[in-house]
Each structure stands twice: as C-alpha cells, then as structure tokens.
C-alpha cells in the first residue's frame, strides 16, 4: 500500500512552475523502449532528463529557485549573487538560471571534479572555485564564502528546487500509463521528493523507489534508521549520488513517501550505462543510469510489470565513457 506524504506545493504552484520551465525548453520525452523491455522482462518507461539544455534534470529546480529568489537578498531588491556547491549538474543548473535572470553565480566544486562538467559550468557563466576533497567539503567552503562575500547560499535541497524538479515528474506521470514503480536516483533528494509529491498530488498508487550507491549509503542508512545518518566517505564513481551528509527535510519526506531505498554497486551501474546505450541509443552519466541499476537489482520482482526509470543526466566525461564502454568499472 502506498503511504501518502504531506505535499509541499499545490497543483496551481506546480502548473506555474511548469509554465516557467516551459519558457526555456519543452517537455522532455518519456519512451517505453522495446529492447529495454526485452532485457528486463517488463514495460520500462525512461524519462529522458538528459535532453534538457544542461543535459540533466536539475535545471528545472535552478530556474524556479532563481526566479523566486532573484529579489530576496538586498535592501535595493536585487540579489548580489548566488553561490553553491556541486559535483556538476546543480552547478550547471544555477549557472544557466543565473544567466537567464541576470544574477552572478559562483560554484564550488571538489578537487578532482569532472573536467567536462567544470567546463560546462564555466560556459554557462559560473565563477568556478575548486576546494575540498569531496562534495561535503566543497559545500562547507561555499557556505563560508557566502558569508565572506555577502552572497546568497543556494542549498542542494530546498522546497523551490523540489518544485522545479517536480515538473518532470508531472510530465512522466501524466504522459505515461500509470506505473507500478518509479526508480529515482537519490543524491541530496530533490528528485525522489519531487516524484513522491507529484504521485501524491495526482492520487496515484505508484511506488517511488530511491536508488543510491553502495559506496555512498547515507540516504539508505538514514531511511532504515528513521533519522539522518551521516557517513565519513562517499567514494563512488556515481558522482551525482555521492552524498555523505543528507538533508534532514529530504530524509523526512523520503521516509514518509518512498517505498524503499535500493543500494547498487558501481559495477552494476556500469552495466546499466552499457544497457541504456544498447537499448535506447542514449548515453547516460553514471547517476543517469543508477535508476536502471536499481531496477536491475529488483528485476525478478518487476517481471511483467510497468515501471519508470529516470535518466537524470547525460553529462559523462570522455575517459569515463571510454572505460565503461570497454567493459570496465572506473576506479574512484
């Protein structure tokens, strides 16, 4: 039985968010690929968030957040600038939105971050700073810089980010036949919380299943414990879900509305990247394939069903792509 959660926005707010996002790009496709159905033994609808202008779902949240906060920060009614931390897609999202609304954006990334994602953030206009050994360290540095430079710190999880991201869940759930289960990647939680909220807003019986990396299990541990559990490391090639300090509000919503959290290995995620390329002719980044990895882990229980997976992004580096397509799993 599906457990309902408190929906953080109204239908009217979701419609307005969809209108705003629609000023920048149209709905992304959702397709039921026949080769993928043959491979899984179920009807599988893929939500192609790799088809947004930034190649990932987070641009939706960036647009809604920036539009809502562009007049928040100073006495003269203008934002001095936004700052945040990212492994890539959140930063591209804010850089894209900042350019759209005329707001300067500073992004902090950890050392060793994807060169291609760094280049994309700079191309969208971000002032990029490299600091810290991982995402959490970069986030702490961004918070300090926000105070030092009088910038508005954009969190990785916020109700307005969830509202923006919910526009893709709305497209999927209204555009596909009713799904038994939707598998969603979980980093800081905006995607899974958005799917839970839209499912409940539409009164559907779809299970929402979050997928995380075995080597970044903080959300899975938090879900099992019923409260936030941090980890010391999140060393996974699936960089978009490399979270070691979950957001408390996100965990509360996930506990209230998700059916379960599935942990997958880097090796299974690499298999999922290759399978998506072979069956859909799309190339996901690892976090864009991790939802399929979750489905692969539960393939036996989904036989003959109708499921959705979120291909959350396609921003993969060339060297990583070459290694995965050669049949390997990149080392971290």
Q: Model-flagged regions — what are they?
A:
Residues 1-332:
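PLP-dependent amino-acid enzyme catalytic core
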